[in-house]
Amino acid sequence: MRNYSVIVTKAAADDAVEIIRYISDNLKNRKAAERHLELYLDTLNSLKEMPGIYGISTMEGLYERGIRLAPFGNFDVAFTLDEQNATVTVLRVLYAMSDLSNKFKKQ
């Protein structure tokens, strides 16, 4: 099985920290924050082994850029896949019910 390098951008790392911190501090649910962190890390690990199982999103603004979404809990890891160089680039970690296409139009 082919292994892929996973690069997490600063924006994605900041998103993940903000999500975990919000759940822990604002919602006062440390256990849920720990579960979400574990799910996030599991998702990153799955991208190392089989990123192709997540298809390119059909949402406007994402499809054109080849952005794929890997769900975990109520969130999505937005990433691109470079098969030729066996590289996954994690762009953002966002609430799944947010207007994802609008967030990527701004970038």
Where do the language-model regions lie?
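Enriched for short, Lys/Arg-rich terminal
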Residues: 72-76, 80-107
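Residue-level signal for pocket-adjacent positions within structured domains
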Residues: 1, 51, 95, 99
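Basic/aromatic recognition patch in beta-strand/loop cores that engages polyanionic ligands
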Residues: 50-84
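Compact soluble domain cores
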Residues: 39-49
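Arg/Lys-rich, positively charged N-terminal/basic patches that mediate binding to nucleic acids
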Residues: 1-39
